[in-house]
Structure formats: C-alpha cells, structure tokens
C-alpha cells in the first residue's frame, strides 16, 4: 500500500520522512476497510473522504500514522469539524478496534495498541494544546484515556504515560492563557496628536537617535521584538485564516471561532513600527537632521535585510513611503538614496513580489544549512505570508467533484505553516537592550493627521491639493483643541 506524502522530510528529518519506519507497519485491513476512499498518486496521499482520513489517523496493532500526516490532518481537519468532534470520532474508532482485538486471536496485543493510541494523543496535545481548552474536548480525552488504561491494568505503564501527557497539557494551556492575559494588558504605543501650531519640540524630548545611533544594534533589537511577537502565533491561528474565510463565504458565523489575538497583535506591531518611523522623521524640525534620520532608517532597514528580518524591513520602508514622509522633497533631495533604491528593488511588488521571494528563498536555504542561531533567522513579511495562505486556499477547492477532500491542497498549506513555525522557534542570538526595546514599544507615535501637520510645517504645501489639505487639517485640529 502506498504511504503518506514526503512533503516534510527536509524539515522533520529522516525519522519522519513520510515513509513507513520499521515497526510502524501499514494500516491494517487497508486503512481500516476505508482504503477505497483514500487516493494516492506516486505514493502520496492526495485525496480521501473525511471518514477515511479520520481512520487513517488512528493507529492499529501493526500501523502508526506518519508524523507529517498527523500534523497535516489535525491542522486541516478544523476546517471541516471542531477538534472535539474529531476527538469523539477517534474515540469511537478506538472502541471498535479494542472490541475487535478482545474478541479475536490478537487479544495479547491490546497493550501495544493502547500504547500507540496514547502516543497519538501525546502528539496531538503537544502540537495543538489549545484544542483541549474547552470542556467537550477534555471530556473526550478523558473518555479515550480511560478506555486505553483498561488495556494495561497490570503494570500501569500506559496509565503513567497518560498522567505525564495530561500534566504537560495542563502546563501548556496555563502558559498560553497567562501569555494572552499579559499581551492584553500591554497597551500599544500612545498616539500623539502632534503639534497644533508650529513649535519646537522640548529640548528634553528624545528621538530614536538619542537612544540608539547604531543601525545594526537597532536592527538586532527589532529582530528581538519580532521573534518575541511571532512566537505567540500557533499553527491553528494561521489555519483560522482558512476556516474563517469559509465561514464568511458560507454566510455563517462560527460560534467556536477562537479570537486570533496573536495575529492581530503581530499585524498591529507592523503598523506601529511604520508609524514610528514616519513620526521620527516628520517631527524633526531641521532639514539636516531629517536627512540624517532618513539615512539612519535606510541603514536600519538594510541591516534587517542582512539579518533575514524582512518584516521589520518592510515596515520601515512602508513608513518612509507614507505620504507625509514621501512628500518631503527638499529633505529627500539631500538623502543618498542609492541604498534605499536597492531596498525598494527587493520589495518591488511587481510579479507578485518576485525579488522579495528570491531573497526569502536565499534566507531559507541559509537557515537550513546554518551552523549558528544568527544564520537561522528568517522573519518573512507577515502580511504577504498570510496572503499566500489565503490565495492558496481560494484557488484550490476543499472538495473534489467526487466529494473527496482535496488533501493535496492541505499538504501544501500545512507545509507552508510548518515552515513558518520552524522560523518562529529560532532563539534570538543578539543581546537584549531593554532601553532600546522600551523606546521602540512605548514611544508616542503621531496620528495620520498629526503626521501631515508636522510634514506641512516642515515643508509647506506645493500645490492646490496640498494647500487645501493643509488648511482643512489646521481648522480641524484648532477646533478640536
């Protein structure tokens, strides 16, 4: 019988290559009698009915599913059913197999069967602990573990493994809950309304150059923040992009849809960094100092690129391309823009960001062959990554004409998500500077209105449209005051 796909072999290593390992065996009875509902192509599973795919997940006496399949199916199944329903079906299949073993000649293999079920549950709870945060899932988990414990009442090996698994699960759930509570307490940077009339900033007011004047150091601290923020994103958060869009397409609201707080927080960080860059430039009074500020951020963006921190690089470029900054022609005329032009070339949106994708591929290859943590860093442009997942979902159907689930599609989505998760687990090798990070995370940022006011005060409006905008803004802010 053909085996599960090899898509993750380069990521998970030889022990998880997608091929049956010694002692793993094949799915007994042709995938539990459901092999006719599983379609393989060149040895790769490409489609199947939901029932057959669920049966393919559950071990037998002589079969254990490949880890790549476990991860992919557990991740993608939530598009079709909530985790507690899948867990309930897994429990039913376990009961059926247990009864067959008890009634047949292989009763002695019950202990081996129960150990494999516990191993499957262990992998599930480790990969997706949040699946067990609701009472329904916990009840199903307890029901399954109670049944398999009965298969090894003599020496209690299975019972001990279940106890360890449960303890680890509870610790993971507690840690995630505490992290989310902490994130929700942290306020975003204060929004500064900016000057209402032209005034010089207070002498004591700091800018980024007063905190850090080394582009490399600032790029390293930005990388620290990126890795810290992205580490709170989990595979199921990313798969919600798919399931949420299905809900919208079908005009229904998923009541069990978990808040994608981590995704929103990470997206907000990108926007805050862009606005901080624009604020730092626009609030500088002297043109010479604004020029220096722009050149500094260009150097920071270049260092981010060299590190592999494409998300911060894109945020910085986006900040410098905001209208209040981009319109400062007199300032830009003094800037040595050759390095900025190179950065914009890397982020050129033409041909679906072809240049960026080439650079990302190079960083990925460097990461795979890396000998140090520094070489392993890959932080993609998150908005583009999300769009890739979204479009991959939109251009390929969930179901084929014969009613099968298009599992080939979910292999690819899962592969991309797994690769992203690998990048998020890299330990940042740079020394942490609390002073710099505090400034980056808490420095007041101008609102869009305030940015335009500061920009116009630095370089007056040059055409009728700008003059009208400037007049309207001044009137609005004065009335508001």
Curated annotation (Swiss-Prot):
PROSITE patterns to which the protein is assigned, alphabetical: RASGEF_CAT, RASGEF_NTER
Gene Ontology cellular component terms for the protein in this record: cytosol; plasma membrane
Keyword Transferase: no
Domain Ras-GEF: 214-461
Pfam families given in the database record: RasGEF, RasGEF_N
Role according to the record: Guanine nucleotide exchange factor (GEF) with specificity for RAP2A, KRAS, HRAS, and NRAS (in vitro). Plays a role in cell migration.
Descriptive protein name: Ras-GEF domain-containing family member 1A
Protein encoded by which gene: RASGEF1A
């Amino acid at each position: 019988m053909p085996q599960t796909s090899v898509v993750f072999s380069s990521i998970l290593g030889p022990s998880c290559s997608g091929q049956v390992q010694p002692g793993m065996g094949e799915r007994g009875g042709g995938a539990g009698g459901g092999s006719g509902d599983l379609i393989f192509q060149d040895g790769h599973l490409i489609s199947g009915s939901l029932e057959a795919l669920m049966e393919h997940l559950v071990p037998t006496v002589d079969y254990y599913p490949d880890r790549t399949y476990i991860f992919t199916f557990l991740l993608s199944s939530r598009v079709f059913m909530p985790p507690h329903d899948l867990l309930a079906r897994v429990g039913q299949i376990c009961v059926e197999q247990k009864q067959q073993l008890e009634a047949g000649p292989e009763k002695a293999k019950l202990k081996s069967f129960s150990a494999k079920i516990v191993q499957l549950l262990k992998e599930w709870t480790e990969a997706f602990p949040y699946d067990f945060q609701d009472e329904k899932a916990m009840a199903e988990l307890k029901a399954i573990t109670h049944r398999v414990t009965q298969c090894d009442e003599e020496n209690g090996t299975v019972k001990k493994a279940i106890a360890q698994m449960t303890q680890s699960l509870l610790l993971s759930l507690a840690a995630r809950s505490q992290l989310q509570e902490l994130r929700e307490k942290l306020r975003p940077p204060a929004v500064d309304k900016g000057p209402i009339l032209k005034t010089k900033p207070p002498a004591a007011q700091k800018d980024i150059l007063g905190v850090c004047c080394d582009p490399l150091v600032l790029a390293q601290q930005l990388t620290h923040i990126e890795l810290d923020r992205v580490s709170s994103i989990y595979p199921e958060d990313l798969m919600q992009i798919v399931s949420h869009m299905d809900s919208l397409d079908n005009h229904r609201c998923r009541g069990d849809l978990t808040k994608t707080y981590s995704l929103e927080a990470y997206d907000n960080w990108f926007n805050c960094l862009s606005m901080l860059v624009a604020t730092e430039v626009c609030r500088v009074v002297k043109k010479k100092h604004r020029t220096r500020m722009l050149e500094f951020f260009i150097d920071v963006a270049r260092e981010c690129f060299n590190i592999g921190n494409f998300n911060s690089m894109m945020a910085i470029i986006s900040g410098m391309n905001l209208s209040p900054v981009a319109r400062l022609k007199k300032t830009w005329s003094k800037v040595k823009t050759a390095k900025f032009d190179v950065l914009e070339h890397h982020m050129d949106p033409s041909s679906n960001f072809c240049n960026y994708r080439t650079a990302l591929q190079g960083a990925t290859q460097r990461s795979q062959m890396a000998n140090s943590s520094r070489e392993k860093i890959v932080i993609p442009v998150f908005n583009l990554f999300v769009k890739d997942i979204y479009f991959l979902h939109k251009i390929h159907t969930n179901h084929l004409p014969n009613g099968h689930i298009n599992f080939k599609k979910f292999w690819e989505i899962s592969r991309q998500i797994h690769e992203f998760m690998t990048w998020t687990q890299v330990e940042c090798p740079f020394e942490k500077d609390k002073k710099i990070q505090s400034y980056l995370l808490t420095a007041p940022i101008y609102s869009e209105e305030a940015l335009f006011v500061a920009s116009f005060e630095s370089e007056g409006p040059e055409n009728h449209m700008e003059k009208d905008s400037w007049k309207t803004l001044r009137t609005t802010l004065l009335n508001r005051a």
